[in-house]
Amino acid sequence: VLLGVLALAIILERLWTLRRNEVLPPGLGQEVRNWAVRGRLDASHIQSLRASSPLGALLAAALDVRGKPRDLVRERIEDTGRHLVHRMDRHLNALGTIASAGPLLGLFGTVVGMIQMFLGILDHGVGDVNQLAGGIGKALVCTAAGMVIAVPSLIMYRYFRGRIAGYVVEMEQEATALLDAMESGKAGAAARPPSAAADARLAKGRA
């Protein structure tokens, strides 16, 4: 019963925490790319982004090292991603342990019940067959209870792991898009001054 309550609490907590809108807020990636293009990457924007969601934390990590070589930025993204996965995996190890240990504990209870029943037979004889069958049934209830707890726990454990893996892929895509946007903005900024200088020289020549 205790394992069942614990498993239910973990499942409900993870369902609430791993909601898509909480991990990957809609439109956040595009909004941050617009910041990058417009040069609105001040410390307050980045700090609020970092605290907003796991996706925001990943994009903020990329912005912390903007202007550095792409390999360094990607390394920072991967490092931050590992920390975020660890945070999203919170309590899942416990849920997986419950899924694995539930049937074993149920089987243990069944074995103990069977041993007690056979020891009773040794002391008092077989007695009533119906009573013997009832004792066996009560012992098997332990195994059934363990499986009732383990099967949903295993299903939800796999579900959460799959959801987290999907989130990680999407966050990496958003981070890559941000890198591309920053590099495009950098290239555009580098291309503008020569053009401006050429226009100035042309205007001076006309004068």
At which residue positions do the language-model features occur?
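Predominantly long cytosolic amphipathic alpha-helical stalk/bundle segments
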Residues: 21-108, 112-126, 156-207
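Pore-lining and gate-forming transmembrane alpha-helices of multi-pass membrane transport proteins
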Residues: 1, 130-161
